């Protein structure tokens, strides 16, 4: 049976939470493989809302949930999020939750640095959540990170913290911040160690054993492929790789173990924060999409920018992530529009192109080339079969398939998990 990677095919906020929850009921193991607690989503089960930003979605269904080595872990947020779920009646214990022992930790110094940089970025606002994600990844790449396993070896922790602070205190002096004492970070770590250590494991071994046993594994991506540090709209990206290939590197399970890549794709386009957005609408249509689609960030509460569906960027993501099929979400938000536009190509300096260029300047200059389709007055909300959809809505979906070069495997027509049209089961071989 196939294992499934879920990846956002746009700039995040595509509705992955509902789809992951829908799939997690069919999965045996759910794995987070990148990011941190900077991208949140809400699950609604039996009328109860669960807000998650670090923990895998499978926890609310009692499935084995794994935080992979590709995730940066804020230990204090981990404790807070687990306590919040327990208060809602979710049983969390080492039988259902594992953390990769080689995952890097987010510390208070990372949050300080993140906030300071974002506040003084010389006009270039990346739009980070100021939760320390980027600086934590920097320390990982710089080979000075404190990792989860270090909490189990307190006798070796002090020299590692000293080495880390030799770097950070140099930065803090340059930014006019007070230096941090080694004892401060040691206390920060040791105060939470006992609440973290029961969950640590060599998760690559756990996943390999579960794969060999025939378990279905769901890899839960955060954010979107266009925020990928390599393939996204750099520098307006996140600090990790968000494309589907990261599922292997960020979990320790080899790429041949990954079968189906499901790209979660919104029926229009949104983006939070700064960066290029060729199809952005700063008019009443953009306001309509934002209001009807409730486009506000789960973690930050920031209003999302809205625009028409951009087939160029999704087609590009289909290739860079090897997307097998897409889950098209929020189709119901388009109900009632007289006409709907799809960006099919760009114009750059007088030339037509079918890709998003890599350079920041070129990305800012591209202009969308649209095709206009008739809208529909009937509702798609709550549809659970193709026969429930208006004819023009079906034509819209089919045209998207043609333009991006990937079929629709699932179609979501409301926030309710049951309002889903299944075309192809991603877990089916």
UniProtKB/Swiss-Prot annotation:
Active site: 13, 41
Ligand binding (substrate): 298-304
SMART domains membership: Adenylsucc_synt
Residue positions binding Mg(2+): 13, 40
Annotated keywords: Cytoplasm, GTP-binding, Ligase, Magnesium, Metal-binding, Nucleotide-binding, Purine biosynthesis
Family annotation (Pfam families): Adenylsucc_synt
Pathway: Purine metabolism; AMP biosynthesis via de novo pathway; AMP from IMP: step 1/2
Binding site for GTP: 12-18, 40-42, 304, 330-332, 412-414
A GO BP annotation: IMP metabolic process
Location(s) in or outside the cell: Cytoplasm
Cofactor annotation remark: Binds 1 Mg(2+) ion per subunit.
Broad EC category: ligase
Reactions it catalyzes: IMP + L-aspartate + GTP = N(6)-(1,2-dicarboxyethyl)-AMP + GDP + phosphate + 2 H(+)
Cofactors that this protein relies on: Mg(2+)
The EC number(s) this enzyme carries: 6.3.4.4
One cellular component term from this protein's GO annotations in UniProt: cytoplasm
Gene Ontology MF term list: adenylosuccinate synthase activity; GTP binding; magnesium ion binding
PROSITE patterns listed in its UniProt record: ADENYLOSUCCIN_SYN_1 (PS01266), ADENYLOSUCCIN_SYN_2 (PS00513)
Residue positions binding IMP: 13-16, 38-41, 129, 143, 223, 238, 302
Protein function: Plays an important role in the de novo pathway of purine nucleotide biosynthesis. Catalyzes the first committed step in the biosynthesis of AMP from IMP.
Subunit structure and binding partners: Homodimer.
Similarity comment: Belongs to the adenylosuccinate synthetase family.
Protein name: Adenylosuccinate synthetase
Organism whose genome encodes this protein: Brucella anthropi (strain ATCC 49188 / DSM 6882 / CCUG 24695 / JCM 21032 / LMG 3331 / NBRC 15819 / NCTC 12168 / Alc 37)
Classification lineage: Bacteria, Pseudomonadati, Pseudomonadota, Alphaproteobacteria, Hyphomicrobiales
Gene: purA
């Amino acid at each position: 049976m196939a294992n499934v990677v879920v990846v956002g095919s746009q700039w995040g906020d595509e509705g992955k939470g509902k789809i992951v929850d829908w799939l997690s009921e069919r999965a045996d193991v759910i794995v987070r493989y990148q990011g941190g607690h900077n991208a949140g989503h809400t699950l609604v089960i039996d009328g109860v809302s669960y807000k998650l930003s670090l923990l895998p979605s499978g926890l609310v269904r009692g499935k084995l949930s794994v935080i992979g080595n590709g995730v940066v872990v804020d230990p204090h947020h981990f404790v807070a999020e687990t306590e919040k779920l327990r208060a809602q009646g979710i049983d969390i214990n080492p039988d259902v939750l594992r953390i990769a022992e080689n995952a890097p930790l987010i510390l208070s110094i990372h949050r300080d640095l993140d906030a300071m940089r974002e506040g003084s970025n010389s006009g270039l606002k990346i739009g980070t959540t100021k939760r320390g994600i980027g600086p934590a990844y920097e320390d990982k790449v710089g080979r000075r990170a404190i990792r989860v396993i270090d909490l189990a070896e307190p006798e070796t922790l002090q020299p590692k913290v000293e080495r880390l602070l030799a770097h950070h205190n140099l930065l803090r002096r340059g930014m006019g911040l007070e230096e941090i004492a080694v004892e401060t970070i040691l206390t920060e770590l040791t105060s939470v160690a006992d609440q973290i250590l029961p969950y640590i494991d060599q998760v690559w071994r756990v996943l390999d054993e579960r794969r060999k046993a025939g378990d279905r594994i769901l890899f839960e991506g955060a954010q979107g492929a266009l925020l990928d540090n390599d393939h996204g709209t750099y520098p307006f990206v996140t600090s990790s790789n968000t494309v589907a290939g990261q599922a292997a590197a960020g979990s320790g399970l080899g790429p041949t173990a990954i079968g189906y890549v499901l790209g979660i794709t919104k029926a229009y386009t949104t983006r939070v924060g700064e960066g290029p957005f060729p199809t952005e609408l700063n008019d009443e249509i953009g306001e309509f999409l934002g209001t009807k689609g409730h486009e506000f960030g789960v973690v930050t509460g920031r209003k999302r920018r809205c625009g028409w569906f951009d087939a160029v960027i999704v087609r590009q993501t289909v290739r860079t992530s090897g997307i097998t099929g897409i889950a098209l979400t929020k189709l119901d938000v388009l109900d009632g529009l007289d006409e709907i536009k799809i960006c099919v190509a760009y114009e750059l300096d007088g030339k037509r192109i079918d890709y998003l260029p890599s350079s920041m300047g070129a990305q800012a200059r591209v202009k969308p080339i649209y095709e206009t389709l008739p809208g529909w007055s009937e509702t798609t909300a709550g549809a659970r079969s193709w026969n429930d959809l208006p004819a023009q809505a079906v034509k819209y979906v089919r045209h998207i398939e043609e333009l991006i070069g990937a079929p629709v495997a699932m179609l979501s027509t409301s926030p309710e998990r049951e309002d889903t049209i299944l075309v192809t089961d991603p877990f089916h071989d």
